[in-house]
Amino acid sequence: MAREKLKGKAYQKELLALQVELCKLQAWVKHEGLKVVILFEGRDGAGKGGTIKAITERVSPRVFRVVALPAPSDREKTQMFVQRYIAQLPAAGEIVIFDRSWYNRAGVEYVLGFCTPKQRDRFLEVVPGFEKALLESGILLLKYWLEVSNEEQGKRFQARIDDPLRQWKLSKTDLPSRTKWYEYSRARDAMFAATDTRQCPWYVVPSDDKKRARLNVLHHILKQIPYGRVPREKVKLPDRSKKNAYDDRASLKGRRFVPAKY
């Protein structure tokens, strides 16, 4: 039996508590010079964007950096497949979140015919070694697959069609992916079989309930990265210096102001 979906107030209370901890994690990552990669994969409409927004809502974009690469350029198509992702990897004190990642090759590219079966198979063969190299370079890698049901995906796609506030979310691959449900399922299973390793495991997140999925992901991230409290010096707000004071409000007279409509 499905659990009752979380109500707004209960969700916001839990979310805020987890976001406070994410701010502590952020300070620790910066203080210790850690390098973290968190990647999100899943079918279209699985809730990747909303989950990433919940993570980044109250943290610094200088520490948490979101990467959502467009389709490769003609030049990038001639490069090693993971090359454009390597350029986005974190330096010390950074957490990089991939909204889709190098696993595009195992999913959307393969299913929609943007790569050959041979290219997909070669990717699945070499990617565990690539991820092992990331670990050996000091990067902590977390891989999440958001699993949405056929019924829920249909509801979300229909909302993208009908709701003007969501129509921008409807991509060129959404509708074709809808007709290829089982092809995506087989591609997912092949990806797991080849790349769900002991060193770099996949974590599956049921995402029909968006709110619970977001909370579960945030909680899991905090459990996967040990962090402590960073000592902070007591800060005293300084007074405004009156040296060279002048009427700075009067100096704005005659400038263009945004109309105070509200």
Residue ranges of predicted features:
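Glycine-rich phosphate-binding loop of ATP-dependent small-molecule kinases
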Residues: M1-Y262
